[in-house]
């Protein structure tokens, strides 16, 4: 599926959240379902094909800032203002575990290890913590404190943990070798996503830029910018799609930008809002920010989560 066949048609609008949606992810495998986390302290499970709300998960006392789903779709983890990492059972909507220890809000989470046996979290307290999802211990099995500011993004690939921080650095922890590598971006990091090959990663920073970074050398392979693309205030999560041939990111004005990875050229600018304009607040209004995007490789669909409380699912039109 070449980049010029990128899906640009809104095929579903998922509503129900009362406040900005901060996190969106497809279920594992076929990606039949979508999980969302929002300012209203709720996690919701939707079937985008029917636009039906299937389940609401209520345990957070503060905003939900990130989500991750296990490979078997039986569990998911959520984090936010509670300073706690929640591990959920999907069918029963009950929490299996609650990991406490962070000193401030938890911004980001991921599964890792064989059989998704560990959880990784990053916090405003500047630490990355690794938790044993299988044991009953409440204490983290590892804590990394190298960041000089809030940890905004974590992801796991094999035995490596990628951690992006407001201090302008991406740190890659090799858990097998016991070493850390540091790439200096300069501007505050809001999002980190490794490529499928693992030899590079996409990073978003608060200078209205995305960059594709070479994993071994730390060199910038490609920069993605546009005169109309603004991201200087709010945390925006970007992603790669179409077999890593496109970079996708929301902006602070209610639109989504799609770049060709090889050339760095802008392919599409799409409006998250139905009326196709900036809405009430203009740029830098929380209501207009498209804070997260997610790609579904099998279905050739993707989703955008907005400050307007809606999630838009995009596909190929008839």
Q: Regions from the language model: what does each represent?
A:
Residues 1-25, 30-33, 37:
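Intrinsically disordered, low-complexity acidic/Ser/Thr/Pro-rich linker and tail segments
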Residues 9-11, 52-55, 94-97, 138-142, ...:
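A structural motif specific to WD40 beta-propellers
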Residues 14-21, 57-64, 99-106, 144-151, ...:
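WD40/WD-repeat beta-propeller blade N-cap
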Residues 24, 43-46, 85-89, 109, ...:
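WD40-repeat beta-propellers
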Residues 24-31, 67-73, 79, 110-117, ...:
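Loop/turn segments within WD40 beta-propeller blades
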Residues 36-40, 72, 78-82, 121-125, ...:
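Conserved strand-to-loop turn within each blade of WD40 beta-propeller repeats
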Residues 103-183:
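Solenoidal tandem-repeat scaffolds enriched in leucines and small polar residues
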Residues 291-318:
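Blade-level signature of beta-propeller repeat domains, shared across WD40, Kelch, NHL, RCC1
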